[in-house]
A protein has these predicted regions:
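Short, basic/polar, glycine-containing "phosphate-handling" surface segments that engage DNA
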Residues: 1-203
Length: 203
């Protein structure tokens, strides 16, 4: 369940995300996904996809009915997080992993992308890629809030992979997150204005 304590714990992990072990802890222990830790065969990768990677993609974790929602980690050859390279890899992996969160790091594990592809029944229409960037120069408060809300304990135990995908799609919706922020800001601003009015009247 989402709590401020969980968000702080996730924030600490994101700030210290320098290796795969921290990523495993994040999903296995903090967000309660099932441990898989299984490499995906390089033989199934196209040459174009394999050329982007320093090693085979890792099926890190899973969730939902039959563990059919997947968390997949890929380490790129480059120090840059190439969006074009990520798209090549994701377009390939989506064919066998339609319900998934994709995570990328650069070669040195100093920068990361958590990548959501909004679900559509037609694979060819899945073109909306949304990313959370994690790195030393990034502001991670919003990232920690979004990722905390992916906690499987906050999703029914018998949820289908589509239901988990839908939760991910909702949490990566920047417009919704922005609207929630402004709604909260407006609420507190209204309270402050009422406080000032009451203060002026009492004076």
């Amino acid at each position: 369940m989402f709590t401020l304590q969980l968000q702080q714990s996730v924030l600490d992990s994101l700030r210290n995300l320098k290796n795969i072990d921290t990523l495993k802890k994040l999903f296995w222990s903090q967000l309660n996904y099932e441990r898989i830790n299984q490499t995906l065969s390089r033989r199934k990768l196209t040459e174009a996809v394999a050329n982007e990677l320093i090693e085979e993609p890792l099926l890190l974790a899973s969730g939902g009915t039959n563990n059919a929602f997947h968390v997949i980690y890929s380490r790129l050859k480059s120090e840059e997080l190439s969006r074009q390279g990520e798209r090549k890899i994701v377009d390939h992996l989506l064919k066998e992993h339609p319900y998934a969160l994709f995570i990328f790091s650069n070669k040195s594990h100093s920068r990361w992308h958590f990548l959501n592809v909004k679900y559509d029944n037609t694979l060819q229409k899945r073109k909306l890629f949304r990313r959370i960037t994690v790195g030393e120069d990034e502001q991670l408060r919003t990232a920690s809030e979004i990722i905390s809300r992916l906690d499987l304990e906050d999703i029914p135990a018998n949820a289908s992979p589509l239901e988990i995908q839908t939760r991910h799609d909702q949490e990566f919706d920047v417009e919704a997150v922005t609207q929630e922020f402004f709604n909260t800001y407006r609420k507190y601003l209204a309270r402050w204005c009422n406080y000032r009015v009451n203060l002026d009247i009492s004076n």
